A protein has these predicted regions:
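Conserved beta-propeller blade signature
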Residues: 22, 88-91, 160-164
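Loop-centered beta-sheet repeat module
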Residues: 72-116
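Surface-exposed loop and turn segments in beta-propeller and other repeat-based domains
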Residues: 1-6, 44-72, 108-138
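Loop/turn-rich, solvent-exposed surfaces of beta-rich toroidal or solenoidal domains
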Residues: 141-178
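Short loop/turn segments immediately following the C-termini of beta-strands
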Residues: 26-28, 52, 94, 166-168
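Signature of short aromatic-glycine-proline-rich micro-motifs recurring in repeat-based ectodomains
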Residues: 6-13, 65-82, 129-153
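Short, solvent-exposed loop/turn segments at conserved positions within beta-propeller repeat blades
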Residues: 29-33, 74, 94-95, 138-140, ...
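Beta-propeller blade signature
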Residues: 1, 33-46, 97-105, 174-178
Length: 178
């Protein structure tokens, strides 16, 4: 199973609540990159694919295209993982300028919500997953390093998300977006 994945260990791994390693990975023979999340078990070294973003966003994936000169389709460009609780993740997609919360990552992954541009996701079939913007602030664009932080001063169920905002929205695999 290990040889099935190309593992990019730069900043794209975290430890789960059992100290297993969750890693952003690319399937070795796939034509896509950085669109899978795998778990490496700490005791056995066994590798399990937890999340395949093509399974979660198939309609969006079908609208993307390989940029000229590219070797693989980096259609989401996931650049950070942050564990929310024992079974949820916050991921950052630079290619879509979207923050995505995934639930049930160990059994039946689903998208809980997304934070991104209404313009980017309108009529995509996924726009109902977007949280509503309730204040006047700049939306993130090409963000990196999204980090989940609990704070006991916040009401139950609320938390902070910190991120580095590149403030540059580029989507090379979705050329119709400008």
């Amino acid at each position: 199973m290990f040889l099935k994945f190309m593992i990019q260990v730069i900043i794209n791994y975290i430890f789960d609540s059992n100290n297993n390693i969750l890693v952003l990975a690319s399937e070795k023979e796939a034509k896509t990159s950085e669109d899978k999340i795998i778990m490496i078990e700490k005791d056995s070294g066994n590798i399990t694919e937890l999340v395949d973003l093509i399974d979660l966003l198939p309609d969006y994936y079908s609208t993307t295209s390989l940029p000229d000169g590219a070797e693989d389709l980096d259609w989401m460009h996931i650049n950070s993982l942050s564990l929310v609780d024992k079974t949820s993740l916050i991921i950052s997609s630079r290619e879509t300028s979207t923050i995505i919360k995934l639930d049930n990552i160990y059994s039946n992954p689903t998208i809980d919500y997304m934070i991104g541009s209404d313009n980017f996701w309108q009529e995509s079939g996924y726009d109902s997953l977007l949280l509503n913007k309730t204040s006047d602030f700049s939306m993130q664009a090409g963000q990196h390093c999204v980090t989940y932080v609990e704070d006991n001063s916040l009401p139950q169920g609320q938390y902070y998300l910190y991120l580095y905002n590149n403030n540059l929205a580029v989507s090379t695999t979705h050329p119709d977006y400008d």
